[in-house]
Amino acid sequence: DLVTHLDTELRISEIEDYSNALNGLQMENHHGTVSKIAAAVDATLPVMRKAAAAGADLLLVHHGMFWSGLQSWTGHVFQKLKLCHDAGLAVYSCHLPLDFHPTLGNDAVLARALGLEPCGTFMKTKGTENGARIETEIARDELAKRLESATGARVHVCAGGPEIARRIGIMTGGAGAEVAA
């Protein structure tokens, strides 16, 4: 089934995460089938409303329903649970296992969007190798152009070091705080 496939592909049981991540199926739907999937970063009430309105049976999120820890089932927490139950919307969350995935993770996806191919990792977070390590030769200005094109955002270059980059590390998300300057 889909949940088993996701759990296996993303190595849910193998990768340590923050205690409130609660990776995997967080809420099942009452009919047990999936024909339409919605995806979002956070499992917020507005996101769940949009997913339900679109007729989704499954909402895939990066930060799940319990990210803030234990909470009483009142207010917006109750509204989220009731909405999902009434709409038949299952919720599946995947945090660090998705971040660290060698082909589906943000680091690998960004590398490919830049026209670069990761050749390994360069750090460990919670005991798991992560961060896309790239060995290439690319001019700083060319890399900045590719980054602007891939992200649609303006890139600010703080030039330093050689004009040609030969080793690049890509680290998305909060784990960048674990890299010493």
Give the residues covered by each predicted segment.
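Hydrophobic structural segments
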Residues: D1-A181
